């Protein structure tokens, strides 16, 4: 079985490295030539377009930045939809909203009869590399059962959440909402402690000994204090996801005040070219600057 991966960003890179490590036949298409050369040296087959990759893959995992990029690799002239491989299963890991995922799945089915599974994941590049993602899948159940063993290569948990494409994307956005708000709470706690004359490292040590600790406080806290914003998830992509959350809340006529405020803060932080390509936890630096004026 050949697994194609489209997208060589941070998450895609982690997935590819994991599959190569397990001895899987991996086909790769992406835009970063340096990464493509690296993967080729590791044993992956590199393709110049998505169509050719799709022709020679049994399953494709798509992992691109946004809805526009997803439509491009699916529907452009040399996109996946131009291939003749009618047995193809597409597992899309891109963070899009439920309507966008449903749009792609319907168009894929109507044009080619391919199977399209909405497959967003929780976890970052290191989790992917260790096979510790959490995969959330919605779409045709029989197709999910066919590829579950592939998802288990990169995941510690795989959840099938329903026949309707897009359901898993709604869960993903609701989960990512927690990332934004928890990171803001952690940032404000650090700032309050610091400006009260308390060593932020002491504050964080105590926090992480309580039930208030989170994966974010344990993984990111000390990096934030050191102003180390090496990205596992870009600030600009966090803002993109928050925008999707707010779009969903408006469609559902929901009032999400914390998410709305998060959107304002992350958007303001993202106005800095220097910050937008740093880790999302750089929101701490932004808030600290506001409190140092």
List the predicted regions and their residue ranges.
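Hydrophobic residues within alpha-helices
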Residues: 15-16, 104, 150, 192
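Helical "substrate-binding/catalytic lid" subdomain
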Residues: 165-286
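Rossmann-fold dinucleotide-binding core
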Residues: 96-176
């Amino acid at each position: 079985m050949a697994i194609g991966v489209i997208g060589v960003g941070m998450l895609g890179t982690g997935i590819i490295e994991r599959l190569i490590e397990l001895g899987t036949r991996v086909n790769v298409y992406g835009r970063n030539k340096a990464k493509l050369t690296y993967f080729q040296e590791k044993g992956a087959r590199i393709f110049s377009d998505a169509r050719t990759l799709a022709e020679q893959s049994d399953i494709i995992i798509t992992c691109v930045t946004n809805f526009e990029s997803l439509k491009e690799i699916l529907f452009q002239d040399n996109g996946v939809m131009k291939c003749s491989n009618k047995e193809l299963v597409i597992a899309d890991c891109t963070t899009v909203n439920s309507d966008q995922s449903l749009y792609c799945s319907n168009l894929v089915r109507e044009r080619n009869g391919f199977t399209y599974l909405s497959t967003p994941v929780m976890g970052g590049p290191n989790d992917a590399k260790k096979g510790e993602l959490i995969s959330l899948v919605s779409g045709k159940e029989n197709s999910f059962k066919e590829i579950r063993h592939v998802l288990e290569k990169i995941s510690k948990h795989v959840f099938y959440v329903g026949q309707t494409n897009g359901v898993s994307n709604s869960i993903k956005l609701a989960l990512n909402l927690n990332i934004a708000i928890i990171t803001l709470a952690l940032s404000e706690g650090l700032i309050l402690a610091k400006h009260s004359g308390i060593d932020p490292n002491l504050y964080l040590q105590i926090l992480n000994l309580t039930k208030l600790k989170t994966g974010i406080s344990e993984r990111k806290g000390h990096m934030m204090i050191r102003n180390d914003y090496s990205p596992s998830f870009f600030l600009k992509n966090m803002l993109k996801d928050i925008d999707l959350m707010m779009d969903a809340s408006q469609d559902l006529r929901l009032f999400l005040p914390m998410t709305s405020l998060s959107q304002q803060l992350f958007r303001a932080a993202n106005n800095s070219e220097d910050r937008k390509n740093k880790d999302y936890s750089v929101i701490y630096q932004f808030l600290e600057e506001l409190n140092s004026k």
